[in-house]
Regions:
Chain A
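Secreted/processed peptides and extracellular or luminal domains of membrane proteins
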Residues: 178, 232-235
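The canonical Cys-X-X-Cys-His
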Residues: 172, 217, 223-233, 266, ...
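Extracytoplasmic/periplasmic beta-strand context in beta-sandwich domains
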Residues: 138, 183-186, 218, 241-243, ...
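Electrostatic cytochrome c docking/interface patches
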Residues: 111-115, 193-222
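Extracytoplasmic electron-transfer domains, predominantly the class I c-type cytochrome c fold
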Residues: 200-212, 236-303
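Membrane-embedded segments
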Residues: 93, 99-107, 114-191
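Signature tryptophan residues that serve as conserved aromatic anchors
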Residues: 102-104, 195-198, 269
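Extracytoplasmic entry segments of secretory-pathway proteins
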Residues: 1-125, 206-207
């Protein structure tokens, strides 16, 4: 574990340096503005002050000081930048994250796991993430982990991600349309064992269920064209219109992490998607209560 | 007092230059990031474009000549120079139109690929400037028949500056669009 | 003597808006003073509209998970708020001051091209109206004021909003270029004999340099807009990555305009401050040459810093480093100016009028904006804080705390000249303190919101620690600003109803605009003093203590 190279620590350190210098400068400006404004306020019968046109030496001294300060910060900047963004020449990413309007797709390259929105990473390990976008520009930002990276269609961007064990939240940071504010990021940094368990559970097929509701739901999933936007196979990259729903029930949240993954929420969502999330691409399918029940049951079995 | 009109025209074309720089940058940028363009550039008729370039450069010369004639009060020479300029620039525009028609026949259009988008936008905006120039020269030319006395030096020199600018922009366009892919 | 330009209008007093017969004359006017006032009124009109939009934004964000307006409407509102404030409030406001004052300050009686001047105004005006017409034509643009492609492309923004945005901005852009051409030629050709370029009042100098920035920057925006329009209307593929276009090129075009634009909005403001502070300190500007030269430095550097808006798009460290260096450099001439303004106050005799207080408030608030701006040159900090509320706070400290405060200072300073009446100082103080308190309440805490992780342009947010209270204070501040503007409008109305009492030179000023009646007659001047220094009226009033002769 090398904390010196962790993004947020470098950023924090630089920000503290900046804050100290900026506070001093701002303090001086405030002090002199108020102090001069008070001390040299016009008094009755005041004489005209001496007409002082300035001093070249003073100006050059000031420019020199400003130049020195900025030079120091420039060196610090270049240093910090090189520490944070040191991507190898032919990067081989561990995770490929693709932005969609408005959800996140994650592909674990070595295991070819495709999942969405709930993204697990091994804790305390540098993970190389590749970013790209399927439609418009999005931006990845988890404030606690430091640095954001835009997801630009047509470009591959790379970034090192490292986190302590725990859950981290963020929101898309480049304006990407109607649901920009609800495009939340949820990262879970698992311990080594937990990550292995999670991975193997993703690779296993979901437990078989013998229930008429399950069969109806599975059939409806095909018939009601859910399948043309959502895959239920963990390895399927296509179709990419909606998130891959394999092991959907194992996720804590859904809808780009804005709703808890409960039966009620899921029911309300499938019943009338635009009511839950306006402008969503998921259409209102005019399903009967029975059909929705069966679909919810089916999806909930995808553990 | 200095010649305000000419000064205005200088700054205006300075500003316009930035506009064309942006369009040329877009063209060059797209040529470099996509591979499709090189196959498409093979469809451009470079020899004809070279002839057209000569036409435009000559028209700049003839406009200069007719301005000199105007200053010396040689009406006939002025009219002659203006008509040569008009003919040459119309030939240039005609050539451009033929180029467009040929490209459209080959299914290379504005909305086909990024080459089409950037090529037609760049040359289209240049042609727009040529047409504005032809109109301005045409107005001066017709004035020389109707009310020659009303023609003023400022108007002619402003149009002349503008026309040279259009010419120079074309040289850059010609270089980046037609010559560069051959190098 | 060829002191005067020949203009067609007869030599009569300025038509008044109270006079029924002359009301139409404003429509056809080519007089720079009337056009200047119309620019300022246009700016005020859109300032009110943009302000109301800001109130909707703050109301929506006052509490977490609010549903006061829908996401789509919120996006229209914040897009229009940004676009309005930048293109229809600050730009015409500063151009209006320039159009009114530059001929007066250089002793001319008109702009170089009066008709072009009127054309520029009306084009800007119609551009603004066209932009607002989008509300009635299927919805305003929803892609933000920088309208990033491909979000602004047809597949992702199918309504006509973006098309209105493009056309509106093209028109106002043409208007700005027209005004800039006029400024440049006016300053170059119509100066009173004896005024050398090195002797210009700083407001004139900065607007002059600014005009070059406009001439260089707006065509780049226009080129980008034209490409976007061709994409949307003629199905070209410039900014559509799925068909070989580039999403990044738009950003390069936009910001290579956008960053000079930031300076376009602040340089004339610097000019106003450089006029107001000396007059109310009874001292000449400290280090004229440095203030003037730093303006040129800013203008040149401003074309080389644009990509610091794009550090997060994934450029290489070399490119980032270059733009970081230029962004650091541009901070230095800006700092020089602040030092010189404070230096002007040193050992002065400071009269705290509303105009001067606005200038002092500007000094402090603009410094905050300038410093937070420098933090974006520190690339890792930018990576963390760009596109967060920290940026929102920063731009408002620059645009509102910088440009708008100095416009207010300028309006209180020059109002007697414009209208022959003094704005009430008492109401002015109310306006100032309500507005300044509200402004700092609204935006100072937004720095912290950004650091805590609130992204910009979100219409709703989770109830995270501190988010609600900080946003609530922010909204409360917006209401104080609203009240401040209301006081300002009331002040304008009651002042315009009072009798004109202003003397030609109420502030004991030094530049030529104070050498004529308030408001000036149609041809501006009856007689003009000979000019031998930067402060012609000072020389006139203090014959035994003249400034150094410069010509």
């Amino acid at each position: 574990m090398n904390w010196e190279t962790n993004n947020i620590h470098i950023i924090r350190e630089l920000f503290v340096y900046f804050l100290v210098v900026a506070t001093i400068i701002l303090g001086l400006v405030i002090f002199f503005t108020i102090f001069y404004g008070w001390k040299y306020r016009r008094r009755p019968n005041a004489e005209t002050p001496t007409q002082d046109h300035g001093s070249k030496r003073f100006e050059i001294l000031m420019i020199g000081i400003a130049f020195t300060i900025t030079s120091v910060f420039f060196v610090l900047t270049v240093n910090g930048m090189n520490q944070i963004q040191n991507i190898p020449d032919n990067p081989i990413p561990d995770i490929i994250i693709t932005g969609h309007m408005w959800w996140w797709e994650a592909e674990y390259r070595t295991d070819s796991i495709i999942t969405a929105n709930e993204i697990h990473i091994p804790a305390n390990k540098k993970v190389l993430v590749q970013f790209n976008s399927d439609d418009v520009i999005h931006s990845w930002w988890i404030p606690k982990l430091g640095r954001k990276m835009d997801l630009v269609p047509g470009y591959d961007n790379y970034m090192w991600l490292q986190a302590d064990e725990g859950e981290y939240w963020g929101t898309c940071s480049e304006f990407c349309g109607a649901q920009h504010a609800l495009m939340r990021i949820h990262i879970i940094a698992d311990s080594e064992d937990d990550f292995k368990i999670w991975k193997s559970s993703q690779l296993k097929p979901p437990p078989a269920t013998q229930n008429p509701l399950f069969e109806t739901g599975k059939r409806l999933f095909q018939e009601k064209t859910c399948i043309s936007c959502h895959s239920v196979n963990i390895h399927d990259k296509e179709p990419v219109i909606g998130p891959n729903l394999a092991h959907f029930a194992s996720r804590k949240y859904f809808l780009s992490n804005i709703e808890l993954n409960t039966t009620e929420n899921l029911y309300a969502w499938i019943k009338n998607p635009p009511a839950v999330k306006p402008n969503t691409q998921m259409p209102f399918l005019a399903l009967t209560d029975k059909e929705v029940n069966a679909l919810v049951y089916y999806i909930k079995t995808l553990r | 007092m200095r010649d305000k009109g000419k000064l205005l025209m200088f700054f205006l074309i300075g500003s316009e230059a930035f506009f064309f720089i942006a369009l040329i940058i877009a063209y060059v940028y797209y040529r470099n990031i996509t591979h499709a363009t090189d196959t498409v550039t093979a469809n451009l008729n470079v020899p004809r474009a070279a002839v057209l370039t000569c036409c435009l450069v000559l028209s700049s010369g003839s406009l200069m000549w007719s301005k000199k004639a105007f200053l010396k009060n040689k009406t006939t020479h002025f009219k002659l120079g203006m008509s040569i300029t008009l003919i040459l620039s119309t030939v240039f525009m005609g050539g451009q139109i033929i180029e467009y028609i040929e490209l459209y026949k080959k299914q290379i259009t504005l909305d086909k690929d990024i080459f089409g988008s950037s090529f037609f936008t760049l040359t289209g905006f240049h042609s727009l400037h040529v047409i504005i120039g032809i109109i301005a020269i045409g107005i001066l030319f017709s004035f020389s028949f109707i009310k020659f006395k009303n023609l003023i030096k400022n108007a002619i020199s402003a149009v002349e500056v503008y026309w040279h600018f259009v010419d120079v922009v074309w040289l850059f366009v010609f270089f980046f669009v037609y010559i560069k892919p051959l190098l | 003597m060829s002191l005067f330009v020949n203009i067609a209008e007869p030599d009569k007093t300025l038509p008044s808006i109270k006079n029924d017969k002359d009301r139409l004359s404003w429509l056809s006017s080519v007089d720079h003073k009337q056009i200047g006032i119309m620019y300022l009124l246009l700016s005020l009109f859109f300032f009110i509209l943009g302000g109301l939009e800001a109130m909707i934004i703050r109301w929506q964000l006052a509490v977490p998970e609010n549903d006061f307006v829908s996401a789509d409407f919120y996006n229209q509102i914040f897009t229009m708020h940004g676009t309005t404030m930048i293109f229809l409030v600050l730009t015409p406001g500063l151009i209006g001051l320039g159009v009114y004052l530059i001929p007066l300050m250089i002793g001319a009686n008109e702009m170089a091209f009066p008709r072009l001047n009127a054309f520029s105004f009306w084009v800007t005006c119609f551009g603004g109206l066209l932009l607002y017409f989008s509300f009635f034509a299927g919805g305003a643009p929803t892609a933000g004021w920088f309208s990033y492609a491909p979000l602004s492309e047809k597949p992702y923004s199918p309504t006509t909003g973006i098309d209105y945005y493009i056309l509106g901005l093209l028109l106002t852009g043409i208007g700005s270029i027209g005004a800039a051409l006029n400024f440049v030629v006016t300053v170059l050709t119509l100066r009173l004999p004896g005024i050398k370029l090195t002797m210009l009042p700083l407001f004139v100098w900065m607007t002059f340099i600014n005009a070059f920035l406009i001439l260089g920057a707006f065509p780049l925006l226009n080129a980008g807009l034209v490409m976007l329009l061709i994409d949307r209307q003629l199905d070209a593929l410039f900014f559509l990555p799925s068909s070989g276009g580039s999403a990044i090129l738009w950003q390069h075009f936009f910001w290579s305009f956008g960053h000079p634009e930031v300076y376009i909005l602040i340089l004339p403001a610097f000019g106003i401050i450089s006029e107001v502070i000396p007059v109310f300190s009874r001292k000449p500007i400290y280090g004229y040459v440095f203030v003037a030269a730093s303006t040129v430095a800013i203008a040149l550097l401003s074309f080389g810093v644009w990509a610091h808006h794009m550090f997060a798009v994934g450029m290489t460290n070399t490119v980032n480093g270059f733009f970081a260096a230029s962004s650091f450099l541009i901070g230095i001439p800006t700092g020089v100016k602040v030092i010189n303004w404070i230096g002007t106050m040193y050992k002065g005799s400071i009269q705290l009028t509303v105009a001067m207080t606005f200038a002092l408030v500007f000094l402090i608030n603009f410094t905050i904006g300038g410093l937070s701006g420098v933090s974006f040159a520190i690339v890792p900090i930018d990576w963390q804080l760009t596109d967060s509320y920290y940026v929102v706070a920063h731009i408002h400290y620059v645009f509102l705390g910088g440009s708008a405060f100095s416009i207010f200072a300028g309006i209180y300073y020059w109002f007697p000249k414009f209208c022959g009446r003094h704005l009430s100082e008492k109401l002015g103080q109310w306006h100032l303190w309500l507005f300044v308190t509200g402004f700092n309440m609204t935006f100072l805490l937004q720095h912290i919101l950004g650091i805590l992780g609130m992204p910009r342009r979100i219409n709703t947010y989770l109830d995270l620690p501190y988010f609600e209270s900080l946003n609530m204070i922010s909204t409360a501040g917006a209401f104080l600003m609203f009240a401040g503007v209301a006081v300002f409008l009331y002040n304008l109305i009651i002042t315009m109803r009072s009798k004109p009492t202003a003397t030609p030179d109420p502030w004991d000023g030094w530049t030529l605009e104070w050498a004529t009646a308030s408001p000036p007659p149609l041809k501006n001047f009856d007689t003009l003093p000979e000019v031998h220094s930067r402060r012609p009226l000072w020389d006139l009033k203090n014959p035994d203590n003249k400034d150094k002769r410069l010509n």
